From Swiss-Prot:
Pfam families: Mito_carr. PANTHER family: MITOCHONDRIAL DICARBOXYLATE CARRIER-RELATED (PTHR45618). GO terms for cellular component: mitochondrial envelope; mitochondrial inner membrane; mitochondrion. This is Brain mitochondrial carrier protein 1. Keywords: Membrane, Mitochondrion, Mitochondrion inner membrane, Repeat, Transmembrane, Transmembrane helix, Transport. It comes from Mus musculus. Mainly expressed in brain, particularly abundant in cortex, hippocampus thalamus, amygdala and hypothalamus. Highly expressed in heart and kidney, but not liver or lung (at protein level). In the nervous system, expressed in cortex, basal ganglia, substantia nigra, cerebellum, and spinal cord (at protein level). Its main location: mitochondrion. Transports inorganic anions (sulfate, sulfite, thiosulfate and phosphate) and, to a lesser extent, a variety of dicarboxylates (e.g. malonate, malate and citramalate) and, even more so, aspartate and glutamate and tricarboxylates. May catalyze the export of sulfite and thiosulfate (the hydrogen sulfide degradation products) from the mitochondria, thereby modulating the level of the hydrogen sulfide. Also can mediate a very low unidirectional transport of anions including sulfate, phosphate, (S)-malate, citrate, L-aspartate and L-glutamate. Belongs to the mitochondrial carrier (TC 2.A.29) family. Solcar repeats lie at residues 42-131, 139-224, 233-323.
Amino acid sequence: MGIFPGIILIFLRVKFATAAVIVSGHQKSSTLSHEMSGLNWKPFVYGGLASIVAEFGTFPVDLTKTRLQVQGQSIDVRFKEIKYRGMFHALFRIYKEEGILALYSGIAPALLRQASYGTIKIGIYQSLKRLFVERLEDETLLINMICGVVSGVISSTIANPTDVLKIRMQAQGSLFQGSMIGSFIDIYQQEGTRGLWRGVVPTAQRAAIVVGVELPVYDITKKHLIVSGMLGDTILTHFVSSFTCGLAGALASNPVDVVRTRMMNQRAIVGHVDLYKGTLDGILKMWKHEGFFALYKGFWPNWLRLGPWNIIFFITYEQLKRLQI
């Protein structure tokens, strides 16, 4: 009979141990659930909404930038002619020759791009910052730049197919045929998955530069204006900060942006090699065939777009942040 108390004792020990493991597991699960519920979803949603508003408001300027950047290519007969002398000339000529709707050629994939790119970019940027520092006062330029570069690369890579279609629709204007979904399918059927991610490297490089410059410059400028007592957390502060970061972003990103635009606009043709094999190759070829300042083609519309785009975006974003949701 002495064996039964031993068996019972072992059984009870196993049951208590199992119960302890289960309780511990529930506690860890509860902690994890609490941490997950603590993740802030607002930067993702607000970033996407503000990006869509800013994109729609500045799209015609972005279209003229694309037209200016693709023209004058001595090694691509489709865009060899220099049709536009500048941003305003391009706006008036496109309106006169193609109609007002041509100024919004590519708006559908552009808004789709911002719905994905803008949402992911701002959400990841804000989330990464909170991983490094808990308080806004502890943020530094270096930390913000690292977070900006990472969020820019991830978001632009995911949204690349919409960028490809947008640029092709902008470049061809009223000559572009087909719907947005049909055009995605056509690119995939004719050029494969590679076609949808054509130019993804310079796109990610540009995004790393733009986001890695714009968002940190905005945050640091805003922080300085508020902490120094020059301005409070007002719309004027948001305006000055966004204008400054737009100029900084345009200066830093324009050369890569020109190459990216041309790489996305070139098509895969059997028996032909790509005109530009990569960012560095594109920059060197443009410098050689068109001169150094070709790298800053479309700079004024680029800045005049990034300036108003950032102003609209950040003011909209800051106002959304104040909503009691």
